[in-house]
């Protein structure tokens, strides 16, 4: 779990522990609730993929050099390496990522869960071109020109107000209807279970 060498080499370790220690739990869940783990054993999955990459690289090297390799991968190393984007953000700008309501993106809005008549939909306007498309689909063309919402920074500054407005606009139809309306123009997904 922690590699073959070092003071923790003999410690047992499991996915959920790695999620906690690497910082995943500090990013997941409602801001007013306790930290939460992923719903799946993502560190186990990512470690398996990392090992597969290492194995392929080792085979390619052995094929070209005639010499085999000793491969070593640990759950903790993989979990920590997956925090690279947030670590870079912290090291370069001092930004500490925190849990946000409705699984919102830290700097893009709208990019979170919204309520529909019968449940939830995740809308992800991660490019400016999607904002006018969303406004048109919601029959709210006036939002496109509103100075509070016509760019990412404005929408981020007014995220709470915009969340209420979008919730209200989506409240008159079920999720499936919205997916048909958004099809191909607004990135959106239903919240499904198994």
Give residue spans per PLM region.
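Residue-level "edge-of-site" marker
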Residues: 194
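Aromatic-enriched alpha-helical interface/lid elements that frame and gate functional surfaces
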Residues: 110-191
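Active-site-adjacent "lid/gating" segments in soluble enzymes
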Residues: 1-121, 125-126
């Amino acid at each position: 779990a922690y590699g073959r060498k070092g003071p923790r080499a003999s410690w047992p370790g499991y996915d959920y522990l790695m999620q906690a220690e690497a910082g995943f739990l500090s990013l997941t869940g409602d801001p007013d609730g306790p930290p939460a783990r992923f719903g799946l054993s993502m560190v186990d999955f990512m470690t398996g993929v990392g090992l597969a990459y290492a194995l392929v690289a080792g085979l390619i090297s052995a094929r070209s050099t005639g010499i085999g390799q000793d491969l070593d991968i640990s759950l903790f190393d993989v979990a920590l390496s997956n925090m690279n984007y947030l670590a870079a953000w912290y090291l370069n700008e001092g930004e500490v990522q925190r849990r946000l309501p409705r699984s919102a993106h830290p700097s893009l809005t709208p990019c979170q869960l919204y309520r529909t008549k019968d449940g939830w939909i995740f809308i992800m306007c991660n490019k400016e071109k999607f904002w006018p498309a969303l406004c048109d689909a919601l029959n709210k063309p006036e939002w496109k020109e509103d100075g509070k919402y016509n760019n990412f920074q404005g929408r981020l500054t007014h995220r709470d107000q915009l969340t209420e407005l979008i919730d209200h606009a989506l409240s008159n139809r079920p999720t499936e209807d919205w997916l048909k309306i958004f099809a191909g123009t607004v990135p959106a997904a239903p919240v499904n279970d198994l």
